[in-house]
Swiss-Prot record:
Subunit structure: Heptamer of 7 subunits arranged in a ring. Interacts with the chaperonin GroEL.
Stated family: Belongs to the GroES chaperonin family.
The protein, known as: Co-chaperonin GroES
Native source species: Pelodictyon phaeoclathratiforme (strain DSM 5477 / BU-1)
Keyword presence, Chaperone: yes
SUPFAM superfamilies for the chain: GroES-like (SSF50129)
Highest rank taxon of the organism: Bacteria
PANTHER family according to UniProt: 10 KDA HEAT SHOCK PROTEIN (PTHR10772), CO-CHAPERONIN GROES (PTHR10772:SF58)
Subcellular compartments: Cytoplasm
Coiled coil: none
Keywords: Chaperone, Cytoplasm
Lineage of origin: Bacteria, Pseudomonadati, Chlorobiota, Chlorobiia, Chlorobiales
One GO CC term, this protein: cytoplasm
Length: 95
């Protein structure tokens, strides 16, 4: 992947959608929920504060993150799906 996010944006590779229920039933494509977690694959330099100081990003490449259902912009690069979102759209870092 050859994407470099700008400012306080991050690129997240969403987790794969569940294929089966816990009971073993297969979920059709129309019934699958979008995953709300994934792995950060690229981060921008950070946000510029009002005083001109660069604020470092709290997430790093490789972080597993939890985000909102409608967070980010979906993009497809080289056949892979990603989300581009602001760091503030991320709710938590997992584990």
């Amino acid at each position: 992947m050859n994407l470099k996010p700008l400012s306080d944006r991050v690129i997240v590779k969403p987790a794969a959608a569940e294929e089966k229920t816990k009971g073993g039933l297969y979920i059709p494509d129309t019934g699958k929920e979008k995953p709300q977690y994934g792995e950060v694959v690229a981060v921008g330099a950070g946000k510029i504060a009002d005083n001109g100081q660069l604020l470092e990003m709290q997430v790093k490449v490789g972080s597993k993150v939890l985000y909102g259902k409608y967070s980010g912009t979906e993009v497809s690069v080289e056949g892979e799906d990603y989300l581009i979102m602001r760091e503030s759209d991320i709710f938590a870092i997992l584990g």
